[in-house]
C-alpha cells in the first residue's frame, strides 16, 4: 500500500522521470509524468501509447524514465497493459518469479484515452485488470500539429478547426466528458478521479489511491499545453489553476456512485478570465464566450459545483 502524502514537503525526493527529454518549455504533460512517477515509485511499469510523451521522450539518448517503460500504439494502451498484468499474475501464480506485483500504469494523451484508444481502455476496465489508466489531457493532438481532439474546448482555433467566415467560432463541438463516460459506463469500476498539475499533492494522492485499489482505476489529468493553447511557457501552472477556478475543469473523485469534490471553491471566476489568456480563443465574440459559460455552468452542476460566478474585479 502506498501512503498518503501530507504536503509537498513530504513528497518523495526520488525522481523517476528525469531531465533529458525534449518536451516543449512549460510542458504540462511532462510535469504530469514527473508527478505520477514520483507518486508511484520504483516498482512501476509505464505503458506509453503514441502521443506527445512518446514522441518527445524516446529519441536515442533522451529517455527520461528510471523505471521500465514500453511503447504501445495509440489504439491499444489498454490492451498492452492487460497483457502485462496477466503475464505477471501468471508468473507469480506459477512461481516463475518472486518479484512483487508492480504498479502498472498507462499514460495516454487525450487521443489515446478519449478518442482512438477508448475501445482498448474500456475493454481493460470491463475485464477488471489491475491497471491504473491515466489520461494526460492537453486538449489536442499536439505532437502532430495541434489538431482538434474530443477534449478540445468549444471555440478553440486548431489546425482542423480554423475560424473563418463560415464557422467564426472555430471548433463547433463541445468536449467529451470522458471521466463520466468511464464512471457511468463501467459499473464495476471502483475509482475514477480527475486531477490537475496545479494541485500536485492532490494529484499524487489520487495516483496512490488509484494504485491501492484492487482492480482497475482511471484518472483524468488536466495538463495545459503552451504551444497548442498559445500562452507563455511560464504560465502553465497559472492556466491549470484558472481552469479549475473557472470550472472549465472540475476536480473530483467518483466512488460508490457519488461525486466528491477535491477543491473547495467559494466562487467561480468567469470563463472569460481563463480564455482571454490563450490565443486559441482570441477570435471569439461575446456570444461565443457566453455559450461556453453556459456549458461550463451545466457541467459544474452535474458534479455538485453550484457556487456563483464572480469576476475578479467585482
From Swiss-Prot:
Alphabetic keyword roster:
4Fe-4S, Iron, Iron-sulfur, Metal-binding, Oxidoreductase
Protein's name according to its UniProt entry: Oxalate oxidoreductase subunit beta
Q: Cofactor(s) for this protein? A: [4Fe-4S] cluster
Which EC numbers characterise this protein's activity in its record?
A: 1.2.7.10
**UniProt-listed InterPro entries:** OxalOxred_beta (IPR054952), PorB-like (IPR051479), THDP-binding (IPR029061), TPP_enzyme_TPP-bd (IPR011766)
What does UniProt report on the pH dependence of this protein? Optimum pH is 8.7.
Cross-referenced NCBIfam families, in alphabetical order? OxalOxredbeta
Amino acid at each position: 500500500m502506498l501512503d498518503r502524502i501530507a504536503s509537498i514537503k513530504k513528497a518523495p525526493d526520488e525522481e523517476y522521470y528525469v531531465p533529458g527529454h525534449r518536451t516543449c518549455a512549460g510542458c504540462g504533460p511532462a510535469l504530469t509524468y514527473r508527478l505520477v512517477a514520483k507518486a508511484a515509485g520504483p516498482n512501476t511499469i509505464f505503458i506509453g501509447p503514441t502521443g506527445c510523451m512518446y514522441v518527445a521522450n524516446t529519441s536515442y539518448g533522451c529517455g527520461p524514465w528510471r523505471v521500465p517503460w514500453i511503447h504501445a500504439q495509440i489504439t491499444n494502451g489498454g490492451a498492452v497493459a492487460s497483457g502485462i498484468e496477466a503475464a505477471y499474475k501468471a508468473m507469480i501464480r506459477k512461481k516463475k518469479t518472486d518479484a512483487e506485483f508492480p504498479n502498472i500504469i498507462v499514460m495516454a494523451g487525450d487521443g489515446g484515452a478519449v478518442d482512438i484508444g477508448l475501445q482498448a481502455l474500456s475493454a481493460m476496465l470491463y475485464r477488471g485488470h489491475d491497471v491504473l489508466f491515466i489520461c494526460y489531457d492537453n486538449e489536442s493532438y499536439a505532437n502532430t500539429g495541434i489538431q482538434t481532439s474530443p477534449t478540445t474546448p468549444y471555440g478553440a482555433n486548431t489546425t482542423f478547426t480554423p475560424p473563418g467566415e463560415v464557422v467564426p467560432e472555430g471548433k463547433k463541438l463541445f468536449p467529451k466528458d470522458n471521466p463520466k463516460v468511464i464512471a457511468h459506463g463501467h459499473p464495476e469500476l471502483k475509482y475514477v478521479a480527475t486531477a490537475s498539475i496545479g494541485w500536485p499533492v492532490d494529484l499524487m494522492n489520487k495516483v496512490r489511491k488509484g494504485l491501492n485499489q484492487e482492480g482497475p482505476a482511471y484518472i483524468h489529468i488536466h495538463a495545459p499545453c503552451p504551444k497548442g493553447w498559445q500562452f507563455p511557457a511560464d504560465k502553465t501552472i497559472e492556466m491549470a489553476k484558472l481552469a479549475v477556478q473557472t470550472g472549465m475543469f472540475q476536480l473530483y473523485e467518483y466512488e460508490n456512485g457519488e461525486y466528491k469534490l477535491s477543491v473547495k471553491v467559494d466562487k467561480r471566476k468567469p470563463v472569460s478570465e481563463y480564455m482571454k489568456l490563450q490565443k486559441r480563443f482570441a477570435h471569439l465574440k461575446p456570444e461565443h464566450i457566453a455559450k461556453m459559460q453556459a456549458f461550463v455552468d451545466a457541467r459544474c452542476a452535474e458534479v455538485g459545483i453550484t457556487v456563483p460566478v464572480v469576476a475578479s474585479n467585482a
